[in-house]
Amino acid sequence: MPRDLTSQDSVRQDSVAQDSVHRDRVIAGRYRLAGPLGGGSEANVQKAFDLHSGDAVAVKIFRCSDAANEAPFRREVDIHGRLRHKNIVRVLGSGTTGHQEGGEIRNFLVMELVEGMDLRTLLHHQPASPRETAEWVSGIARALTYIHRRGIVHNDIKPGNILVNLAADPGGPGVAQLTDFGIALTGGTATPGSSSGTPHYLSPEEVRGENSTTASDVYSLGLVALECLTGTKAFPGPPLESMVARTLGEPRIPGTVRRRWSMVLHAMTDPDPAGRPSASQVVGMFRRLSR
């Protein structure tokens, strides 16, 4: 049965409401803003209407155009903008807003509007069922397979960067779609200490300041899968405490998790990157789990 998603607390308006980008404002002469969808430290996301096509879209507006925000924006344009996959939120365009209040000029991305919620919000309501977990995690694993074959490491796999498109799967679990490539890496690996992903989902090697690789994405997805089933972070607590725990052992998998699932989760969160399955192997593992 599809879960009840009538609650509207998925819209995180606290930081967005303070932003100088207002509802009904038209940016770049084309996109009429229609209200906040969410936001983070670097950008806020607004629902908008494309006045040229009439389509509803999502516009990600970066908070300022200084050097600190220019790099994530360029990565989104150069990396995310060229990706085309069912399980990746599609970038439709980009630009600058022109002069804002206070004379600021802001970069923005135009993306497909996903009718649903981010995974963090869904798990706040209740843990996912095994069926939902298998569907969502295998979808993101397919997205990772696609980007890894192109030499891209997402570098920030977490529930907040996974959107569940409910409209694309009426009556079903929904289609999981990966978003936010602001700290993605190209070339397959990064220089040591380069990871700036979310502390609670970093791999042990990233915590130690080692290379971020495709195996690091798989580890983070393993933590997401475990959180789907339990409703709680695998390594809770303050960020530093959580990261230290990562280097001391594997995540604890409750006895309530079925043995077949436990084996897959242990493989994905192997402390040794070389011991983890590839993203394409994860797809096969979850296909077998869902039978």
Give short role names for the model-derived ranges.
Residues 34-40, 45:
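Protein kinase glycine-rich loop
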Residues 63-82:
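AlphaC helix of the eukaryotic protein kinase fold
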Residues 94:
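Activation-segment/catalytic-loop signature of the eukaryotic protein kinase fold
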Residues 101-118, 122:
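Conserved short submotifs of the Hanks-type protein kinase catalytic core
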Residues 136-137:
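Activation segment signature within eukaryotic-like protein kinase domains
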Residues 142-152:
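Protein kinase catalytic-loop region centered on the HRD/HxD motif
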Residues 217:
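Conserved catalytic-loop aspartate of Hanks-type protein kinases
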